[in-house]
Amino acid sequence: MKQGIHPNYVEITATCSCGNVIKTHSTVGKDLNLDVCGNCHPFYTGKQRVVDTGGRVERFNKRFSIPSTK
């Protein structure tokens, strides 16, 4: 490797809004503040909500369905 052309790779601290502190390495060189992490993200905590689109699907099918003739 060439000397003097690579960025400094230093240890930084990433702090989440929930209080979780993660130590990692980066070339950024300054500490990070995170909005969500693995401890508080809804997908990982099991608090994820499923958006109900049933009414919209029914309305679409009603609007664009072929009328049945009996």
UniProtKB/Swiss-Prot annotation:
Pfam families xrefs: Ribosomal_L31 (PF01197)
The UniProt record lists the keyword rRNA-binding: yes
Cofactor: Zn(2+)
PROSITE patterns linked: RIBOSOMAL_L31 (PS01143)
Gene3D superfamilies found in the cross-reference section: Ribosomal protein L31
GO terms classed as biological process: translation
Keyword Nucleotide-binding: no
Task performed by this protein: Binds the 23S rRNA.
Protein name: Large ribosomal subunit protein bL31
Organism (species): Glaesserella parasuis serovar 5 (strain SH0165)
Taxonomic lineage: Bacteria, Pseudomonadati, Pseudomonadota, Gammaproteobacteria, Pasteurellales
